[in-house]
């Protein structure tokens, strides 16, 4: 009887360890995929943005990472669709940032 309980405990422990290792491996793979995707995005940004525009996007990324991510994804889509023919300068990037920020901005109203 005690041996059966001990055997069940060992099996449960092994199952938990196996499940933990699988989750850890899946998490590592997800991190690796995210890093590869970010490297591809960075390479495209170097191609399509002027140095000033890249610098601005980097500063935006520090303050509003979700906005910077949206801008990067929009620019990547435009680049892949062949709609970006010349490098985007700082002024154009400002306009793009303003448009995307206006679309995603939420307005808060406090009623008394």
From Swiss-Prot:
From what superkingdom does this record's organism come?
Archaea
Q: GO terms for CC?
A: cytosol
Pfam families named among the record's database cross-references: dsDNA_bind
A GO term, aspect molecular function: DNA binding
Sorted alphabetically, which keywords does the UniProt record give? DNA-binding
Where does the secretion signal sit in this chain?
none
What family name appears in the similarity comment? Belongs to the PDCD5 family.
This protein is called DNA-binding protein TGAM_1196
